A protein has these predicted regions:
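Active-site neighborhood of HAD-like aspartate-dependent phosphohydrolases
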Residues: 1-43
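Asp-based, Mg2+/Mn2+-dependent phosphohydrolase catalytic module
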Residues: 1-2, 103, 114, 118-223
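Hydrophobic side chains within well-formed alpha-helices
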Residues: 19, 34-35, 81, 131-134
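Alpha-helical elements of Rossmann-like donor-binding domains used by nucleotide-donor carbohydrate transfer enzymes
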Residues: 21-22, 37, 64-68, 84, ...
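Short helix-capping segments at alpha-helix termini
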Residues: 27-31, 72-77, 130-134, 162-163
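Residues at secondary-structure transition points
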Residues: 29, 33, 53-57, 96, ...
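A metal-dependent, Asp-based hydrolase signature
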Residues: 32, 46-83
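Short, acidic loop-to-helix structural element flanking the phosphoryl-transfer center
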Residues: 59-60, 77-113, 119-123, 151
Length: 223
């Protein structure tokens, strides 16, 4: 099937939990817990801002979530250290399967990065991991001032990728993103990076499930 691929970035191509190593300096043995809460609240804050129609850049959500996670664990950061962690977020590590998968698909499918992140952040984190040049373009929610899983965001992605006449397939490790895309009429493949994670039972199923991006090329042949 001829289609365009839209890759989620955070959690799919790059690993937000990569911040736990840096947080060890501030949180000690609680670093992983802080990093997990940081990510959880980053998403929650973006969802809430989208529903409330009070859009702010994803970086603002990220900073607010960091402050919440630290405060919850009764930890403090200096302004300088907070800024350093925010800067480090722009160089999150890529998953090992990301670059090989994109290279194998490039030329066979139009590839786009599709994210709640803003363009400057996407360019930095993808460029840091040598992923940026694999894409035909970037699609950011910043263009329409809302966040996934708002249906308008997925509709916009169709327009931005030129996918009105052919299918657009989201590739994401975030179940909420996959459900949002499917509800909006897109194909969507769930990357189940953690075998212990279950897909939420909303009566909406992913188009396919893979455990690694290395399985993507073969899976696409069967959609």
């Amino acid at each position: 099937m001829t289609m365009t691929l839209a890759f989620d970035v955070y959690g799919t191509l790059v690993d937000p939990m990569g911040m736990s190593r840096l947080l060890a300096e501030d949180a000690g043995d609680r670093a992983e817990a802080v990093a997990a809460l940081w990510r959880e609240k980053q998403l929650e804050f973006s969802f809430r801002k989208g529903l409330m129609k009070v859009y702010e850049d994803f970086g603002v959500c990220t900073r607010q979530a960091l402050r919440y996670a630290m405060a919850t664990h009764k930890l403090t950061l200096s302004e300088e250290r907070e800024n350093a962690l925010m800067a480090a977020y722009l160089s999150l590590p890529a998953f090992e399967d990301a670059l090989p998968a994109l290279k194998s698909l490039r030329g066979e499918y139009p590839l786009f990065a599709f994210s709640n992140g803003g363009y400057p952040a996407l360019e930095k984190v993808l460029g840091h991991n040598d992923l940026l040049d694999q894409f035909e373009g970037l699609v950011s929610v910043d263009d329409i001032k809302s966040f996934k899983p708002d249906p308008a965001v997925y509709t916009y992605a169709r327009r931005a990728t030129g996918s009105w006449e052919k299918p657009l397939c989201l590739v994401s490790s975030n179940a909420w993103d996959v459900i949002g895309a499917r509800a909006a009429g897109l194909l969507a493949i769930w990357v189940q990076r953690d075998p212990n994670k279950v897909f939420e039972d909303w009566g909406i199923q992913p188009s396919a499930v893979i455990n690694s991006l290395s399985e993507l090329q073969e899976t696409l042949k069967n959609l």
